[in-house]
Amino acid sequence: MRVLHVCSELFPLLKTGGLADVIGALPAAQLAEGADVRIILPAFPDLRRGIPETVLVREIDTFAGRVALRYGHYRGIGIYLIDAPALYDRAGSPYHDASLYAYSDNYLRFALLGWMACELACGLDGYWRPEVVHAHDWHAGLTCAYLAARGRPARSVFTVHNLAYQGLFSADHLSELHLPAEFFQIYGLEFYGQISYLKAGLFFADHVTTVSPTYAKEITQPAFGYGMEGLLQALVRQGRLTGILNGVDSDIWDPQSDTLLPTRYDAENLQAKAINKTHLQTAMGLQLAENKPIFAVVSRLTVQKGLDLVLEALPELLALGGQLVVLGSGDATLQEAFLAAAAEHSGQVGVQIGYHEAFSHRIIAGSDVILVPSRFEPCGLTQLYGLKYGTLPLVRHTGGLADTVVDCALENLADGSASGFVFNECEAQALVKAIRRAFVLWSRPKHWRHVQRHAMRLDFGWQLAAVDYLSLYRRL
């Protein structure tokens, strides 16, 4: 089966969020299952540098000007790059300028991505033509609309990685996009008077997926639907909405083989994990104390991630004898609050603003608990990394967090299914209660190690998701 993924990021070459991790792993897993998989992306500078050897497929005139389609390979996967320097050759983020303002021509930049993907489905590359086009998030949403406008030359799947980002643009741009005027309506890509690239994907795709089963249910409710819940409820009735859990790339995230760690370890050698803890305490200026559990945050610092709750719960966490490590950037108010906490609690709280992939590995390996108290979480990867590394996740019961972490309640400890700590209400006191339960288990090292070993043996590999997606493609 020939599959084309349409997206804007690819780990490790270009990453702003979890989408890049998915595209860096899912196509390779599908290839291993026998599929013929390729990816199409804009030729952003980081991607051009990472894939320097390409051949010209075609040069064509488009509504966005003269464009070259180039083809190369990265880690065994065929990659199409859309070479349009005026649109894509910009330093920094693929989405906004240095002042964090979204590029004013994003509507054109990402419409071209969808249009070129559709052209491939129509035979632009005389040597390869996809049977299934799989578009990811709003950046690729117009792909499904272009395919519908061209009579659906390939089947289409649209994956929502985060419904909060809707790709909204002025309706004045519609005439530039080479889409039928009748597509701009409530049964189409119109959303409260604007064009929504996300809605285009939801409405025109043959099938829609989200990145966890629980998130697929949540987004049909007003609290999580961002105004799209009516359309999503219709997709459920039509049997066109499925939740497929993201996975972990074990080539990158495995404590047995992770070369970024001071010391590698596995479920049978947890003593070596303690060496990583000592290194982390030293690196973050924390008191060297093996008996103090380290709670870690590796995240964008936003209210969506529930990190205001962590700040509220911090006095209790420290009073109980814990330490806190934070790696991330985002909301200026949260950044300043965490830095102030580190200054006030020197030796017990360590904060590094920014994101460093290598250091994130060392934090997850060296910590005892990974905090993911999100208000909503489509899937979440951090808790999966925690499980893999024996760093027990403490999460709120939402989205993919609910699908992947089993609470250390007595009955789950008894039957051996417990893998972390789960709380329900989105409030600081609920988080505090979960932290207290973590300390209770911490006080019983034998039970803690038992849960650690179980967590590390859980299989959240990409092969499971790859099989599920290929099965879905065949049903279309």
UniProtKB/Swiss-Prot annotation:
Its EC number is 2.4.1.21. Gene3D superfamilies: Glycogen Phosphorylase B (3.40.50.2000). One of its GO terms (molecular function) is alpha-1,4-glucan glucosyltransferase (UDP-glucose donor) activity. GO terms for cellular component: cytosol. InterPro entries: Glyco_trans_1 (IPR001296), GS/SS (IPR011835), Starch_synth_cat_dom (IPR013534). It is an enzyme of class 2 (transferase). PANTHER family: ALPHA AMYLASE DOMAIN-CONTAINING PROTEIN, GRANULE-BOUND STARCH SYNTHASE 1, CHLOROPLASTIC/AMYLOPLASTIC. Synthesizes alpha-1,4-glucan chains using ADP-glucose. This is Glycogen synthase. It comes from Yersinia pseudotuberculosis serotype IB (strain PB1/+). The gene is glgA.
